[in-house]
């Protein structure tokens, strides 16, 4: 009887630990709370911290001065996904779509790259995926839920 109780106790503790771990993973990776923008993200070997911040600041100021059209679309599940459209110089016939990565937003990750494409004569569409930046949502879909 004592051995059976020990085995049941170990199984119960293991099950509780597994559920606790799964819940932590779900809430830390899938569920997204709205956050204020923090620091910029650029490849670590690209430039040092001061140069990175200066590049990000200059590029964002340049984009702000240039102006953009705020765009939005409603997803199949009713969320509003937001972005910015920048018109290139002259009459460009190509548009570059820049989609940020995990736990980022359109301006933080792609301000300098958007400037590069605009100066090269392309239209640029910067978007915020669901649960990122200005777009609605609490669950990160890694693009799967945004494809429709």
Regions found by a protein language model. Give the residues of each.
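Conserved alpha/beta-hydrolase
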Residues: 116-136
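Membrane-penetrating hydrophobic segments
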Residues: 1-14
């Amino acid at each position: 009887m004592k051995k059976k109780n020990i085995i049941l106790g170990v199984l119960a503790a293991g099950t509780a630990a597994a559920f606790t771990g799964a819940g932590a993973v779900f809430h830390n990776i899938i569920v997204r709370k709205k956050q204020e923008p923090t620091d910029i993200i650029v490849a670590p070997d690209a430039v040092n911290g001061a140069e990175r911040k200066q590049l990000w600041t200059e590029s964002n100021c340049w984009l702000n001065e240039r102006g953009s059209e705020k765009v939005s679309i409603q997803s199949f599940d009713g969320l509003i996904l937001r972005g910015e459209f920048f018109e290139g110089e002259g009459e460009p016939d190509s548009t570059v779509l820049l989609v940020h990565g995990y736990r980022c937003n359109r301006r933080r990750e792609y301000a300098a790259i958007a400037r590069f494409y605009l100066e090269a004569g392309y239209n640029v569409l910067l978007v915020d995926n669901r649960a990122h930046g200005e777009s609605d949502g609490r669950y990160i879909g890694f693009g799967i839920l945004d494809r429709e």
